[in-house]
Amino acid sequence: MLKVSLISLGCAKNLVDSEIMIGHLHQAGMTVIPDAEQADVVIVNTCSFIDSSKEESIGHILEVHQNRGMTKRRKEQKLIVAGCMSQRFSKDLSTSLHDEVDAFIGLDQVTKVAPIIEGLFAQERSAKAGPLTFIEGKSTYIPDYDTPRFRLTPKHFAYIKIAEGCNHPCTFCIIPQIRGRHRSRTQESVVKEVEALVKSGVKEINLISQDTTYFGMDQWEGERPKPSSPVDSSKGNSLCTLLREINRIEGDFWVRLLYTHPAHWSDELIQTIAECDKVAKYVDIPLQHISDRMLTAMKRVTSGDYIRDLLRRMRAGIPG
């Protein structure tokens, strides 16, 4: 039985990817252990959002490689690099980390990690051959409610990734190039996952994606929303309709919204949060800046006046 150790770096969205990988490893009969020194395979799930996170990821990769070379017992250990850095820079890294890494996998391979590992042990490869790369084009994967997953969070709270990718053209961000265009899960899929988590005893549900406020907009018929389009459930499923459906689920729990984009906030969303008693009166909203000049340079499709007015409307419309 193969033993796998996984190092998860970066944000909560990356953590969910790690949970999905572990779920599929368990399903394949592999054992996941915390101690990399005892593992047959080490997976480093990387982050590359900013330079320091890329440096941290490379540091972990080099550390694992150095440690496995310290003893003969670990010389057959495999090192797999996954996550955002692998997805975006695998071609460059295949050269710079030629001798250190056995395989690079991307965001669409999180459900295929077990057969990839089995394949690494099934074939004889010389060190000179360099790492295998399993990344094919832009990412299109999105999880479903029944996707195998092993939660790494404390028992009382969990993350639910309601969408993947991003359509915003922010000049400082490479996420669209890494994770692709925005693609929402179906509302039914998210609701089913919430129901299952609540039944398992989870008290806090954290909804996450690159832009949670854009949820459902990509599925509107006959409409192509803009980066500044407001949440509007009259056009189809949206974050508002999702929150209302979740609020109807029986149980003692609450929902927290993370990674919202200020450009999509509408009066309907403010009212929905105010009216849904299971939705925490808490908002994670990256304003980034208040200077019009800087916001324009960043392509945030907002302005200082817009942000001030939004905060005023939120304070007035959401008690507490």
Give short role names for the model-derived ranges.
Residues 1-215, 268, 283, 306-316:
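Proteins enriched for Cys/Gly/acidic motifs involved in redox and nucleic-acid/cofactor modification
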Residues 76-83, 88-89, 93, 199-320:
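Conserved SAM/AdoMet-binding glycine-rich loop
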